[in-house]
Amino acid sequence: MEQGVNSNEWHGNAKIFRTYLKGGGKDGKRSVEKHKGLGNIRTFGDAAQFPSFGAVLSDGWVDISFDDAEMSKTFLAIAKDQQWHCMVLENKNNGHIHTYWKDTEHKIQKFRRDQRLACGLLADIHGGDTYIPLRCLGSDRFPPVFDISPDEEYQEVPDELLPVQTNYNLWQMDAGGRNNDLYGYILVLQSQLQLDDDRIRTMYKAVINPYILKDPLEDAELDII
C-alpha cells in the first residue's frame, strides 16, 4: 500500500472517477455544472484550474465517508492492519476522510447519511451521480493519504463496511451489559448480511474488539460470546 503521495504527482484516478467538474457555491462544495447521466465532462487537469472542483464516481464504485476525526483515525488504523485495498482522501481542515471501494455486486443499495456499518463505525455512503469535492476554495483534499500500489487492484467493499439496520451502538462501548449486546449483534450480522460464524468471529477479534470497543475484551471472554 502507498501513502503520502506528493500532490504534484497525483492527477486524479481514472478507475474511481468517471469525470471531473467545476465546483462553486459559498463553501466550494457544490458542482456548478450539470452532470447527471452525462459521461466525461472535464479531465482532472482541466478541472484543477478552478479554485473549487470535484469528481463523479465511475459505475460500480462507492464513497464511504466519515465525518468524525476519531472514527477517521480508527478507520485508517483498521485499513492498514487489514491491508484493505482502497483509496482514502482526507479533508486536512478537520481530519475527516472519504474512502473509495468497488461495489460491482451492488451490495450497498441505499446512499445516505449516518449509516451504521457492520464493524460499528458510522458513515455517509455516496454513489451514483453524487458530486464529490476534491478542492474547496483552494483547499485540496488530495493526494490520497492511503492508496494501493501500482501493481495492486482495488477490492470490493469488505463485510465490515456494509451497512446494517440496528439499534446496537458498538462505537466506544464499555463494560456494563455489552456482552449481551455483542451476542445479540451476532444475530444482526447473520440475518442481514448472511455472515457465517467464522466470518463473524474474525470480525469481532480482528476489528470490533481491538478498534471499536472502548476497552477490548480478553480473548477468553470474547470466546464465550
Could you say what each language-model-derived stretch is?
Residues M1-G95, K102-H106, Y168, Q172-D174, ...:
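Signature for HUH/AEP ssDNA processing cores
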Residues A55-S72, L76, W101-T202, P216:
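DNA replication initiation modules
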Residues D81-Q82, L189, V207-P210:
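Conserved short hydrophobic interaction patches
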